């Protein structure tokens, strides 16, 4: 009944289109509205500002709710586009209320200079709408306000901010289609932190950035970072150019580090698409009003920066996309090294104490006692995974072509039919080590492999597809098809059966087979040499496999990745 009354009040209020304030603003930043408020606001903005606002749907959720986006600005197709998405984790909903507030202030000319001059804003108020409607007071126990909020995951219990590459959720598939269509130069993902307590209000990660590369787009990322830090400081905010997560959990003395996100995450994915990605994390222990305001200021400052530099950044992005990767060494991922510098960090007094509840050490903060921490900051990165790109591209056999094509279509990757020529000389990847995850993660059993590519003769059956490396999404293609990449199809378990043994040789059968094989002097000498290794000598399974792998019955496709390179 309460919800029906609220719906009636909202419908009548927005029908007048004179008051475009959110429930959050009307409540003094104590509450946030439901999804119906977003729909009504979307239409009300469009009605009041038809030349500046377009309210559109880009799909439906599994539970039948509308997926909405709002286009704000003069819609000149030559404008650089800024993408701002909120509520991918629906309990972290600051961005929804912040951008509606900012839109109102811009369109009602409460901001002196128009930050949308020459810029188009694409705003998704709620990415995870089904999760948003799982409303509750304790959905975010590590967060101060609003009074009620949505849930982290979708109706399928998927975390959408792990879904950018595999795109399992219908919501992600729909959103990526829209993202490709509008092609933003800068994309913001608006979140709220978990974790420690400290003074700064927001942490912002921008990639690409000069701390891990030197292209024009990396330089653009650093320029945006520096500009945002200056603007946010001028607007009275305490902001950080990194995500404030301790190197070791609950140990402030271990400090912080920079990192380049893998493409399962929003900002890592946008970087893999050769665009600028921003993760904006307001601090969960600040009150809702403070958090909404810092999101407001961050989006406003970003619009100002893109208005000033956006066209140059678009050119830089296209230059980066047009870089030919074929046959070159490519850095797939990064880590920071052990070098650090001490920084002053505005934290709070804390102590580590033994818990009477769990018996372990826990941290206790004293937010009423600010304290300067001198902690290490790790900012020197190195590539922890490097791969030579194929000279021409990747070949996917017909057995996997159907589902692979569906994934490639979602991400805007071009492919074509492959015409086999009998036995093709191709690069084949065979794993030397593999480790399956012990538990399911996001509905997948992940797999980590090591190995190498080597030339072999391969017979490809009809129905295969070819993904050329010379296209503008080449870096993203390598993230999908290089098996050692952290978010590749292999890593997400799409090819697990290829790395599972299916046939075997009984122990009693091997006894006779091995004795016959030992009549070969070369085999006997190799076996004798291997027996000098204690690990081999004491492991019956390794000794068994030594002979089985040399036998004609051995499965030559076992541990062979069923995608090839040319």
Would you name each region that the model predicts?
Residues 354-492, 496-515:
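Feature captures C-terminal
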Residues 245-426, 430-431:
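Hard-cation-handling environments
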Residues 473-475, 484-566:
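Accessory, solvent-exposed terminal regions and/or long lumenal/extracellular loops of proteins
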Residues 78-88, 93-253, 258-264:
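Active-site/substrate-binding loop(s) of hydrolase catalytic cores
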Residues 58-60, 72-73, 86-88, 124-128, ...:
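Active-site-proximal beta-strand/loop segments in catalytic clefts of secreted hydrolases
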Residues 17-68:
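Short glycine- and acidic-rich boundary segments immediately preceding or forming the N-terminal edge
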Residues 1-19:
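Bacterial Sec-dependent N-terminal signal peptides
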Residues 65-66, 74-81:
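Proline/glycine-enriched tight loop/beta-turn segments at coil->beta junctions
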């Amino acid at each position: 009944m309460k919800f029906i009354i609220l719906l009636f009040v909202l419908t009548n209020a927005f029908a007048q289109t004179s008051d475009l304030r959110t429930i959050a603003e009307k409540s003094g930043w104590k509450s946030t509205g439901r999804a119906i408020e977003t729909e009504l606001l979307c239409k009300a903005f469009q009605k009041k500002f038809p030349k500046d606002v377009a309210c559109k749907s880009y799909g439906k959720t599994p539970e039948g709710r509308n997926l909405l986006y709002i286009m704000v600005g003069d819609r000149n197709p030559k404008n650089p586009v800024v993408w701002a998405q909120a509520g991918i984790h629906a309990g972290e909903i600051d961005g929804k209320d912040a951008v509606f507030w900012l839109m109102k202030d811009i369109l009602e000319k409460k901001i002196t200079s128009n930050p949308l001059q020459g810029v188009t804003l694409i705003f998704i108020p709620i990415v995870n709408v089904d999760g948003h409607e799982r409303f509750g007071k304790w959905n975010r126990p590590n967060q101060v306000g609003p009074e009620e909020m949505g849930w982290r995951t979708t109706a399928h219990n998927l975390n959408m901010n792990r879904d950018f590459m595999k795109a399992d959720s219908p919501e992600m598939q729909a959103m990526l289609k829209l993202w490709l269509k509008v092609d933003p130069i800068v994309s913001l993902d608006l979140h709220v932190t978990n974790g420690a307590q400290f003074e700064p209000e927001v942490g912002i990660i921008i990639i690409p950035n000069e701390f891990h590369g030197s292209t024009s787009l990396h330089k653009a990322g650093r320029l945006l970072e520096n500009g945002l830090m200056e603007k946010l400081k001028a607007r009275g905010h305490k902001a950080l150019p990194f995500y404030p997560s301790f190197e070791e959990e609950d140990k402030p003395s271990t400090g912080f580090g920079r990192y380049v996100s893998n493409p399962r995450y929003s900002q890592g994915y946008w970087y893999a698409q050769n665009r600028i990605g921003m993760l904006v994390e307001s601090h969960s222990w600040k009150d809702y009003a403070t958090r909404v305001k810092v999101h407001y200021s961050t989006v406003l400052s970003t619009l100002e920066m893109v208005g000033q530099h956006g066209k140059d950044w678009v050119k830089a992005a296209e230059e980066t996309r047009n870089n030919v990767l074929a046959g070159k060494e490519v850095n797939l991922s990064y880590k920071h090294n052990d070098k650090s510098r001490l920084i002053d960090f505005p934290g709070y007094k804390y102590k580590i104490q033994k818990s009477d509840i769990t018996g372990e050490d826990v941290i206790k903060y004293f937010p009423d006692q600010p304290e300067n921490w001198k902690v290490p900051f790790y900012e020197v990165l190195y590539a922890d995974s490097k791969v030579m790109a194929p000279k021409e591209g990747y070949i996917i056999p017909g057995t996997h072509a159907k589902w692979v094509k569906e994934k490639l279509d979602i991400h805007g990757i071009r492919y074509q039919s492959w015409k086999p020529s009998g036995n093709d000389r191709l690069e084949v990847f065979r794993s030397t080590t593999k480790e399956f995850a012990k538990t399911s993660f996001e509905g997948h059993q992940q797999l980590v492999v090591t190995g190498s590519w080597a030339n072999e003769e391969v017979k490809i059956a009809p129905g295969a597809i070819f993904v050329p490396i010379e296209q503008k999404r080449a870096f993203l293609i390598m993230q999908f098809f290089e098996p050692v990449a952290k978010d590749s199809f292999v890593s997400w378990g799409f090819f697990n059966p290829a790395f599972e043994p299916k046939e075997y040789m009984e122990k009693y059968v091997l006894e006779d087979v091995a004795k016959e094989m030992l009549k070969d002097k070369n085999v006997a000498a190799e076996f004798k040499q291997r027996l000098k290794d204690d690990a081999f000598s004491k492991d019956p399974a390794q000794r068994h496999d030594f002979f089985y792998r040399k036998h004609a019955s051995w499965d030559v496709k076992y541990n062979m990745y069923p995608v090839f390179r040319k």
